[in-house]
Regions:
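Amphipathic alpha-helical segments typified by the pilin-like N-terminal helix
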Residues: 1-48
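Extended, polar beta-sheet/loop recognition surfaces of beta-rich domains
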Residues: 39-64
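Periplasmic/extracellular, small/polar-rich flexible segments of pilin-like filament-forming proteins
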Residues: 55-170
């Protein structure tokens, strides 16, 4: 009688089929995890922007900071300006939004859905992962963030997939 060593063709096919099933389940689970991570990253960028603007603006009122929102110690927005007549004008929401969405912005967050793009932009339309910041009046900044789980089309029109906050600059 021969002493056969090794696996039969059927045994090998069963192992390959099991590995295929495990791989398929793993890919679906991985996509769910990455979708949730992107959604949470967009929410975190939104919350951090609100805290950043509030903290930086409070520097104008707490101490005598001349400039806020600097990048690497340079640039920024002046807390106030004084004209030749001695009239003081304080920083407006429009100046803050223009600075935060310009080329000299201190913000370095990337859109979690498209890492080639900056997360914060000045726009009234929200694409997935973008934090849209607009000056809605002289003293109000509106922050709108859209996120999606990627299961359907553009879910940014669904208010359940948006965060909206208003920051008052007084």
């Amino acid at each position: 009688m021969k002493n056969n060593k090794g696996f039969t063709l059927i045994e090998l096919l069963v192992v390959v089929a099991i590995i295929g099933i495990l791989a398929a389940v793993g890919v679906v689970a991985y996509n769910g995890y990455t979708g949730a991570a992107k959604k949470n990253a967009a929410k975190t960028i939104h919350a951090n922007l609100i805290k950043y603007v509030a903290a930086e603006y409070s520097k104008c009122t707490i101490d005598d900071s001349d400039t806020i929102m600097k990048k690497g110690g340079t640039g920024g927005v002046g807390c106030s300006t004084t004209d030749d007549a001695g009239n003081v004008t304080f920083v407006t929401a429009t100046e803050i939004v223009t600075h935060l969405t310009g080329t000299d912005t201190p913000l370095e967050d990337k859109n979690p859905y498209s890492t080639a793009s900056a997360a914060v932009r000045s726009s009234t339309s929200a694409g997935a992962g973008f934090v849209s910041i607009t000056a809605t009046s002289e003293n109000l900044i509106t922050v709108l963030t859209c996120f999606t789980d990627g299961k359907t089309g553009n879910e940014c029109t669904d208010t359940g997939n948006q965060l909206t906050n208003t920051i008052s600059i007084d």
